[in-house]
UniProtKB/Swiss-Prot annotation:
This is Ribosomal RNA processing protein 1 homolog. The modification Phosphoserine is found at S622. Residues 596-608 have a biased composition (Polar residues). Residues 288-312, 463-624 are annotated as: Disordered. It comes from the Eukaryota. The modification Phosphothreonine is found at T617, T620. May be involved in the generation of 28S rRNA. The lineage of its organism: Eukaryota, Metazoa, Ecdysozoa, Arthropoda, Hexapoda. It comes from Drosophila melanogaster. The gene is Nnp-1. PANTHER family: NNP-1 PROTEIN NOVEL NUCLEAR PROTEIN 1 NOP52, RIBOSOMAL RNA PROCESSING 1B. One of its GO terms (cellular component) is preribosome, small subunit precursor. Residues 463-488, 497-520, 527-543 have a biased composition (Basic and acidic residues).
């Protein structure tokens, strides 16, 4: 008997499971670490995409994924957080609008506490953020810089809150300080700007996060790395930033610093009435403390915020307790253990002196004195400076200038006449001034008077009537002509024809130079003129011209008879006697003048251009000239302005005055509407 096997019924699900098992058996197994990395890459791509919906969805998922991953068998390491922060960095990069950016910064900062209490992951998350910001800082443009600085401030705030939740654990604070010394506070920082911002905001955010619930010892744990940073950092700008924004900031926010700030603000509002700030004391208002407490209870609490806001919103900054002993110990330890240069040691010793003063209960910073300016006008100050300069100049150069006025022989005789045994450095000027001749002493006094009156621009001196003229003035003075000669020259010039103007200048004027050289001839000429004048009759006929020798001046005035009745002195010698009939007055010029006249007639090889007078102002073709007078370039006092107002009391500005006629021609169209355009009138038009 033949038996048959019953057919086995296999459903579709069982068939699919079998196919998958066969495929899994044929493919090699993938390591779980690679699967985790692939999952991270997928998350990073979603965070850095340009779709805002996808980015927001991934941010919501990321918090849950952090919590699940922290409790799994594959914990986070630093490289994982660096990859994740690469995507979060571009999420913030593409975020737009201030409120949206602030909300995103809050979400990213709140993820510090999203690891289920795993403190190591929280510190690694923050450390990876600071390393990412130091690397990407130079790639941030000016339009995105503010939101990344805001993100840094929020991250620091929420990390300090996380440390506060762990009761300021010393191990956590030490781990936090060591991680910061590897990134933002390293000896060779990658980005100076990021380090400066971190130094600027750290202790402000510590005060906000602590809210008064922190001790001086716990503050010192955060402060110690900054003191070490000041001692070891080579960048002078970072050292100055750490000194002012960390150490000085902690002193200013203390009780002593706030008292000084209040006193200085009051001193400044009063206009610095005293030379020292210690002269101001705080007085009691006179109200009872009970009344103040009642008023404080009645007042409604004002809205406060951790960040400055627009509007009437206050930022409350609690005080951080500062113990100067910790800073002094750390500074002295750094000075003992390290080999610094003289400049670094000088700066550290100055910091030690400041904190020692603060430890004694005195505030060592700020302005303590304000120099008071004496009530002097500018003119008085200028006069004092000029007088001091003149005095100094006289003390230094007075004796030397007086001696330089003398020639070599007189100076030698003057110095020989002085007994130098009685001369010392105190009476040297006095002895020299007494030994000077009176003429030079008079000149020195005159020069001193001129120098002293330069500011007034006038020199007042007494002039004697019979003061003898100097030899130099006598030489420069031209020979005087009597009144009759002047009248004769004037009449002669009136009768002179126009053609004589083209003759050389040497023939038109009297030869004064020859007269100076030959005084005997000049004397003979003068006496001959007087004789001729006496012999002339008193008729009004025109005088006959006398013959002249070649070389005689053509412009010589013709002798004219004097009026009758004029008595002249009798001639004392032959030269004073008048000319007789037939005698002629002959003037023989000097040899030098004859040679000069002969040379002037010879043709010149190089024609001499006539000398042009220097113009005071540039010459233009027009008839009008502008003369710039620098004397008038001065400041006018207010008195001139008041006098001008009295002389012309018209109103300088009249609000009711209409503008004058415009210089522009009116358009032939009265309005801006084109004449060919016909507007449609609506039913509600009122025009």
């Amino acid at each position: 008997m033949v038996t048959r096997k019953k057919p086995v019924k296999r459903n579709a699900e069982a068939a699919e499971i079998q196919v998958e098992q066969e495929e899994d058996a044929s493919q090699p197994k993938v390591a779980k670490e690679l699967m985790v990395v692939a999952q991270e890459v997928k998350i990073i791509r979603a965070l850095a995409c340009n779709d805002v919906v996808e980015r927001n969805r991934q941010i919501r998922i990321l918090r849950k994924w952090f919590k699940a991953r922290a409790g799994s068998s594959f914990p986070f390491n630093e490289d994982d957080f660096m990859r994740i922060w690469k995507g979060l960095y571009y999420t913030m990069w593409m975020s737009d609008k201030p409120l949206v950016q602030e909300e995103l910064a809050e979400k990213l900062a709140q993820m510090v506490d999203s690891f289920g209490g795993n403190t190591a992951c929280s510190l690694a998350y923050f450390s990876a953020f600071m390393r990412t910001m130091c690397q990407e800082y130079f790639g941030i443009d000016q339009w995105r810089m503010d939101k990344f600085l805001m993100l840094t401030r929020r991250m620091v705030r929420y990390l300090l809150r996380f440390l506060k939740q762990n009761n300021w654990n010393a191990d956590l604070i030490a781990a936090f300080n060591s991680s910061m010394q590897l990134s933002v506070m390293s000896e060779q920082p990658k980005s100076r700007g990021m380090t400066m911002h971190y130094l600027d905001v750290f202790f402000e955010e510590l005060a906000k996060a602590a809210n008064g619930e922190i001790t001086a010892a716990q503050v010192n744990m955060f402060l110690r790395p900054f003191v070490t940073y000041i001692a070891t950092q080579r960048d002078a700008k970072l050292v100055a930033q750490c000194r002012t924004r960390v150490l000085y900031h902690l002193m200013y926010q203390s009780d002593l610093g706030r008292q000084y700030s209040e006193k200085y603000n009051a001193w400044k509002q009063m206009g610095f009435p005293t030379a020292s700030i210690d002269d101001i004391e705080k007085l009691d208002s006179g109200f009872d403390e009970e009344d103040d407490e009642v008023n404080a209870e009645e007042e409604q609490p004002r809205a406060t915020s951790l960040d400055p806001r627009a509007g009437n919103v206050d930022v409350h900054m609690p005080e951080l307790p500062l113990n100067a002993d910790c800073v002094l110990d750390e500074l002295q330890t750094q000075l003992r253990t390290n080999d610094f240069n003289s400049k670094r040691r000088k700066g550290l010793r100055k910091l030690i002196q400041i904190f020692e003063t603060y430890q004694r209960g005195e505030f060592p910073l700020g302005v303590r004195t304000m120099p008071k300016v004496e009530g002097q006008t500018l003119s008085e100050m200028v006069e004092q400076k000029v007088a001091a300069l003149d005095k100094m100049e006289d003390e230094v150069f007075a004796t030397g200038r007086k001696l330089k006025k003398l020639n070599k022989s007189k100076r030698k005789r003057l110095l020989q006449s002085i007994n130098f045994e009685e001369v010392d450095e105190h009476n040297y000027d006095e002895v020299i001034s007494k030994a000077l001749p009176p003429e030079l002493q008079k000149k020195v006094n005159y020069n001193a008077k001129v120098r002293s009156s330069i500011n007034n621009a006038w020199v007042v001196e007494e002039v004697k009537e019979a003061e003898p003229k100097s030899k130099k003035a006598k030489k420069e003075e031209p020979p005087q002509q009597n009144k009759d000669d002047q009248t004769k020259v004037k009449k002669k010039s009136q009768l002179k024809p126009k053609n004589d103007q083209s003759k050389p200048k040497i023939e038109d004027q009297p030869t004064l130079k020859a007269e100076k050289e030959e005084p005997a001839k000049r004397k003979k000429l003068d006496h001959s003129k007087t004789k001729e004048e006496q012999s002339k009759p008193k008729t009004d006929e025109q005088p006959k011209p006398t013959p002249k020798v070649e070389g005689q001046s053509k412009a010589k005035p013709t002798p004219k008879t004097k009026a009758a009745g004029v008595d002249d002195d009798a001639p004392t010698n032959g030269w004073d006697a008048p000319l007789e009939d037939g005698e002629q007055d002959i003037f023989v010029p000097s040899r030098k003048l004859q040679v000069k006249q002969a040379n002037s007639k010879l043709p010149q090889s190089t024609p001499k251009q006539p000398a042009r007078a220097e113009f005071a102002t540039p010459q233009t073709g027009s008839g009008k000239h502008v003369r710039i007078v620098t004397k008038s370039n001065c400041i006018y006092p207010k008195s001139d302005y008041y006098r001008q107002l009295k002389l012309s009391p018209q109103v300088p500005y009249d609000a009711n005055r209409l503008p004058g006629k415009s210089a522009l021609k009116p358009h032939w169209i009265p309005g801006p509407i084109h004449p060919s355009y016909k507007a449609k009138r609506l039913f509600n038009d009122t025009l």
